[in-house]
């Protein structure tokens, strides 16, 4: 009986370990994940969230601030272009979430920031993507360069 328990437990552990390795080592296809947050059509489901805000500051200033607030591995675009996609990993298991950002200068003093965050795996994210987007936008609005 104990022998079978150990075998089942060992197989379950191996499966969990293999799944964790797959999630952590899965490649990122920019063609699939680097999408324009302003024009993407599938948004605000249970595992993704999109929002935008006007932020005080010219485009270069807002991009510089955003690159400090949002950290992760760039998988598409560049910060300098104002259109970038990053993979951000969850703290416990390292699940990849993709965050696409576009910064457009609305006027000499204002920039429009649009963020689309989504999970690669799973059907629900328990609000993690919404929280991420709202936290980033709040930080940008509260920065010293932003008065609104």
Task: Give the positions of each predicted feature.
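Ser/Thr-rich, low-complexity intrinsically disordered terminal regions
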Residues: 2-9, 18-148
């Amino acid at each position: 009986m104990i022998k079978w328990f150990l075998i089942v437990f060992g197989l379950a552990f191996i499966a969990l370990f293999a799944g964790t390795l797959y999630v952590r080592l899965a490649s990122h296809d920019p063609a699939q994940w680097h999408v324009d947050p302003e024009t993407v059509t599938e948004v605000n489901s249970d595992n993704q969230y999109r929002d935008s805000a006007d932020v005080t500051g010219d485009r270069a200033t807002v991009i510089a601030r955003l690159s400090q607030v949002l950290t992760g591995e760039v998988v598409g675009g560049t910060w300098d272009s104002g259109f970038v996609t990053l993979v951000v990993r969850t703290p416990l298991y390292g699940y990849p979430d993709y965050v696409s950002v576009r910064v457009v200068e609305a006027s000499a003093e204002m920039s429009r920031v649009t963020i689309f965050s989504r999970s690669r795996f799973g059907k629900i994210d328990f609000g993690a993507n919404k929280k991420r987007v709202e936290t980033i936008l709040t930080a940008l609005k509260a920065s010293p360069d932003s008065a609104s």
